[in-house]
């Protein structure tokens, strides 16, 4: 009985029953889990990453034998102050790569295994056949002949050459950078490396097919590009060469000037041909010939001292759009670092970060097939830092932040980039607006047919000025007989010949501030205004009962191709003096006020006619326009008089202040003053009171009450 009771108690125990059910549920879950795992389907099988670029290393070309080409020392001073194209240039780059762990070569002896990031590409001498793809046989034989020349002969050829030097190792050394550049490009094209850096010398982009020049013996990049196109016709049909050396690569350009397989783009100082190599071939309007027309682009710096802002602007506005449209199979950078900050030859301020950013952008072209080949660069520290930044980006590092990302490009550079875009838009769709205004094609010159169905804006501006001055102040036209100019070129107050005191205002056609429609190119008339800088001076003179002559010099007459506003200004002022002003019986005091380029007419008149009896002062607002010297043909003392009686107001950033900060322009330019602001409208507003006070002083009409 007791046992029956115990059994019944156990069966009726709720805790025991719950425990049993939990265990059963757990066993069931385990069973279901096992069944689920055994039946789970494979959707994507495990596989190797389908990428080719990232796993590859960056190739590196370097060979100590390239340092054997050196200048023969003829004095102790050449030893302590070596030639800029110093053999140590490539050593310093190789050394900084090792110091930063990009290569593993603690002895700097050129070991074969460079580590996990870079792959050594053996350097070989280019063959004669490879060099002859670019250079003439005569040039090759001349460089080869230097091997057996005497010291005296080598010095003689160095003296005769165009900024080149020779020794007995020059020929052997010069074949190595050619061969190294070829092998660096081959390694990229064949997929053995993702990109490559050729640390080579002597440089090459100045070497023309028939002659050495500018420290260059053979054109390394041109030889490499020619041979790659020849040997890899299926995989490489188009090559883009980007030359960011501060000097124009005249040799490279000449090698491909008639070739549509190579797009050559060069960013360099030009400055009206004053900067080496100083040939017209470096001008921005040199676009190629024959099949190569449109495949040459020179982005010329009109001033020195350019930096990150200018190079980034050029890349964003010109280089990258052209590169994307060209779709190259290989990109080669002619990588001179003489635009780097600290290089005394280039005198520019490009930072290592900027070189990194430019490299990063070019990596986006040609599926990353990029080869960087050293050209110039003569500050050993600057060239090393810049090359390190480029190498890091090649390996895969993002570029460093730009030191001053908010800096604006120089105005002269912005204008030049616009000229390049307008010119190149003839060949490249990326520079043409797909929804442009159908009324005119602004890439074509304005001609009679366009004028016949459209109304030139500068004509409308002058007509508005004429109506205003006529309606408000009774101005009349002063005829310019036999001069092919608009009738309203010269306006004046009535009875001007009877005036004792005359203000003569000579100005360019007024500017317009306007919002432009980015799609159609039209301007928003409701928010557009004419900036008439001359009106304040006219009203000021009228308040004092002065006679006023207002001279408007058109920017262009459209019809004649050889029209020059500057020359027209000179002719008009001479005409006014010879036919009107010198015959005015009452005139005793004249003040000239020039605004813009047209002020050159005033300076021309003062040098060609003796007006000092009545001319009391000259005020010129030139903004960013070029200074015009007074050339005295009547009296050598005119320059001194002009300096004492003139005020020439320039932009704060005018080029005359950059050339030599410590020196003022010479007296023949007048008394040139640097304003605090830029832009004609701003400097006139800033210096209006100073200018008018100077006129009153010269007229001897100043009083304390005024």
Curated annotation (Swiss-Prot):
Concerning Pfam families, the annotation shows: Arb2-like, Hist_deacetyl
Q: Which residue intervals are annotated with compositional bias (Basic and acidic residues) in the record?
A: 1-24
Comment field (misc): Present with 3050 molecules/cell in log phase SD medium.
Q: What is this protein called?
A: Histone deacetylase HDA1
**InterPro entries named among the record's database cross-references:** Arb2-like_domain (IPR019154), HDAC_PDAC (IPR050284), His_deacetylse (IPR000286), His_deacetylse_dom (IPR023801), His_deacetylse_dom_sf (IPR037138), Hist_deAcase_II_yeast (IPR017321), Ureohydrolase_dom_sf (IPR023696)
Q: Where is this region: Disordered?
A: 1-36
The entry's cellular-component GO terms read: HDA1 complex; histone deacetylase complex
Under catalytic activity, the entry for this protein gives: N(6)-acetyl-L-lysyl-[histone] + H2O = L-lysyl-[histone] + acetate
List the CDD domains: HDAC_Clr3
* UniProt-listed GO biological process terms: epigenetic regulation of gene expression; negative regulation of transcription by RNA polymerase II; negative regulation of transcription by transcription factor localization; positive regulation of transcription by RNA polymerase II
Function statement? Responsible for the deacetylation of lysine residues on the N-terminal part of the core histones (H2A, H2B, H3 and H4). Histone deacetylation gives a tag for epigenetic repression and plays an important role in transcriptional regulation, cell cycle progression and developmental events. Histone deacetylases act via the formation of large multiprotein complexes.
The similarity comment for this entry is:
Belongs to the histone deacetylase family. HD type 2 subfamily.
Active site per the UniProt annotation: 206
GO MF entries: chromatin binding; histone deacetylase activity, hydrolytic mechanism; identical protein binding
Q: What is its EC number?
A: 3.5.1.98
Subcellular location per the Swiss-Prot or TrEMBL entry: Nucleus
Q: Keywords, A to Z?
A: Chromatin regulator, Hydrolase, Nucleus, Repressor, Transcription, Transcription regulation
Q: List, alphabetically, the Gene3D superfamilies matched.
A: Histone deacetylase domain
For region Histone deacetylase, the annotated ranges are: 67-396
């Amino acid at each position: 009985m007791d046992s029956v009771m115990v059994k019944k108690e156990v069966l009726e125990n709720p805790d025991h029953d719950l425990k049993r059910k939990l265990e059963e549920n757990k066993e069931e879950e385990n069973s279901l889990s096992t069944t689920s795992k055994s039946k789970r389907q494979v959707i994507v099988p495990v596989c190797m990453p389908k990428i080719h670029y990232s796993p590859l290393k960056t190739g590196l070309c370097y060979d100590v034998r390239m340092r054997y080409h050196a200048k023969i020392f003829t004095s102790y001073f050449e030893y302590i102050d070596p030639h800029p194209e110093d053999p140590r240039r490539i050593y310093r780059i190789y050394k900084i790569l090792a110091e930063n762990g990009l290569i593993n070569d603690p002895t700097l002896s050129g070991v074969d295994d460079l580590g996990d990031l870079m792959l050594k590409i053996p350097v070989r001498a280019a063959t004669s056949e490879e060099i002859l793809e670019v250079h003439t046989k005569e040039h090759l034989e001349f460089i080869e002949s230097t091997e057996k020349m005497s010291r005296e002969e080598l010095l003689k050829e160095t003296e005769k050459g165009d900024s080149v030097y020779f020794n007995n190792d020059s020929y052997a050394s010069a074949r190595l950078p050619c061969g190294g550049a070829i092998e660096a490009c081959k390694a990229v094209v064949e997929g053995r490396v993702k990109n490559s850096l050729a640390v080579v010398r002597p440089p090459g982009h100045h070497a023309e097919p028939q002659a050495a020049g500018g420290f260059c013996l053979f054109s390394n990049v041109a030889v490499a590009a020619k041979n790659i196109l020849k040997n890899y016709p299926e995989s490489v049909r188009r090559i883009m060469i980007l030359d960011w050396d501060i000097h124009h690569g005249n040799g490279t350009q000449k090698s491909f000037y008639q070739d549509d397989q190579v797009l050559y783009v060069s960013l360099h100082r030009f400055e009206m041909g004053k900067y080496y190599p100083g040939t017209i071939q470096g001008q921005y309007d040199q676009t190629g010939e024959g099949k190569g027309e449109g495949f040459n682009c020179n982005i010329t710096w009109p001033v020195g001292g350019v930096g990150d802002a200018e190079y980034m602007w050029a890349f964003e506005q010109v280089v990258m759009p052209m590169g994307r449209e060209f779709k190259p199979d290989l990109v080669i950078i002619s990588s001179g670092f003489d635009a780097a900050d600290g290089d005394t030859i280039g005198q520019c301020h490009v930072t290592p970060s900027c070189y990194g950013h430019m490299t990063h952008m070019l990596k986006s072209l040609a599926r990353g097939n990029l080869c960087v080949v050293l050209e110039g660069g003569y500050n050993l520290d600057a060239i090393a830092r810049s090359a390190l930044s480029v190498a890091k980006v090649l390996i895969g590092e993002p570029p460093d932040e730009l030191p001053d990302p908010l800096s604006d490009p120089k105005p002269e550079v912005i204008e030049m980039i616009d000229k390049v875009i307008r010119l190149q838009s003839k060949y490249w769709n990326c520079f043409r607006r797909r929804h442009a205004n159908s009324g005119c094609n602004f890439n074509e010159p304005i001609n009679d047919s366009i004028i016949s169905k459209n109304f030139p804006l500068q004509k409308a501006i002058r007509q508005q000025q004429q109506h205003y001055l006529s309606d408000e102040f009774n101005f009349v036209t002063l005829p310019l007989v036999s001069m092919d100019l608009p009738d309203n070129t010269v306006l004046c107050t009535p009875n001007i010949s009877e005036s004792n005191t005359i203000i003569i205002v000579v100005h360019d056609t007024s500017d317009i501030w306007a919002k432009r429609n980015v799609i159609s190119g039209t301007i928003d008339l409701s928010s557009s205004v004419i900036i008439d800088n001359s009106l304040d001076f006219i009203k000021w003179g009228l308040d004092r009962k002065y006679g006023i002559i207002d001279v408007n010099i058109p920017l262009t007459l459209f019809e004649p191709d050889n029209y020059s506003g500057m020359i027209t200004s000179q002719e008009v002022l001479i005409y006014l003096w010879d036919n009107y002003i010198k015959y005015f019986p009452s005139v005793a005091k004249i003040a000239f006020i020039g605004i813009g380029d047209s002020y050159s007419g005033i300076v021309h008149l003062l040098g060609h006619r003796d007006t000092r009896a009545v001319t009391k002062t000259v005020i010129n607002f030139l903004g960013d326009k070029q200074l015009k010297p007074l050339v005295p043909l009547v009296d050598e003392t005119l320059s001194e008089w002009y300096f004492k009686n003139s005020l020439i107001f320039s932009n704060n950033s005018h080029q005359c202040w950059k050339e030599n900060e410590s020196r003022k322009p010479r007296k023949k330019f007048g008394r040139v003053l640097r304003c605090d602001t830029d832009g004609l409208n701003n400097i006139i507003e800033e210096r209006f009171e100073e200018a008018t006070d100077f006129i009153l002083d010269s007229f001897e009409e100043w009083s304390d009450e005024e």
